[in-house]
Amino acid sequence: MRRRDFLKSLAGGLVLIPALRMPLACGNGRPLRFGVVTDVHFARREMAINRYYTEALDKLRAAVEQFNAARLDFVIELGDLKDMGPSGDPAESLRFLDEIESALQGFRGPVWHVLGNHDCDCISKAEFWAHTDGCEKELLHHVAGCYSFRAQGFRCIVLDADFNADGTDYERGNFHWTSAWLPDWELEWLDRELDSAAGEPTLVFVHQMLDHFSDVSSQLVVRNAPDAVAILERHPKVLAVFQGHHHPGFYSARAGIHYVTFPGIIEGSWPAHTAYAIVEVHPGGSIRIEGFGDCPDREFRGKA
């Protein structure tokens, strides 16, 4: 569903909030249900290191078909929606983005995006947002991809770690993929958002990983993740952090917070391989993840 159509049909129960320009969504006791897909990496190029770039389009279309058959409040993709060709041509990469975004928008409901590092490999954040049509467009802080919204009585917070150490945006490959940062202003914004969430159960979405305390490679983790995690742990209503970036997937937990890294849909040849999930979160804090393809099922009966 396009943003303009969604705003005409708010009866679905999801309402955007950060600038408080719209009424707030109220939960009705039923669980929040949403679809998750990450690391699509669509491009029209040859397979490399088990990444089947072109086949990612069919994988995503099949995932969207499954999402449409379920009763979902929204779908969120956790970054690296597109990739680029061997030449790194920006115009070509934008064509890839247009094609894969069209498939994602086949979902008949709200669609949200998270910025990944490959989304800025040869284009800018501004160009990425100009070629996507998610519900987040009116909520963005300039071109930075951090925003929040409410759905079914839950606060959902999306972070953007596509920044260099000096606070500059990732843009046209001016970065190294192992150096992802959350700038000070975004950490302050996160703290304010969590304060304003008050008693609302809260979910956090980000592309690069935050669970620095785990045994995952530090190359995959946001460099100042300890600062972000410290903020999350000060707010007891944070239930989970949902991440991408690490294509095999991963799980860890600390201080009552689940850190779930979903496997990348790009890995392996279609139709033998795919990976996406439907997540169900109950008001009491229990979480059920129904995985498809190479994505495992998970069930958490409350905070970690």
Language-model segments: residues:
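Short acidic, glycine-rich surface-loop motifs adjacent to enzyme active sites
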Residues: 197-213
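N-terminal export signals
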Residues: 5-25
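Short acidic, glycine/proline-rich loop/turn micro-motifs
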Residues: 45-49, 86-87, 168-173, 214-216
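N-terminal secretory signal peptides
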Residues: 1-2
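Extended active-site neighborhood of metal-dependent phosphoesterases/phosphodiesterases
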Residues: 87-201, 227-238, 248, 252-291, ...
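N-terminal active-site segment of His-dependent metallophosphoesterases
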Residues: 24-91, 144, 192
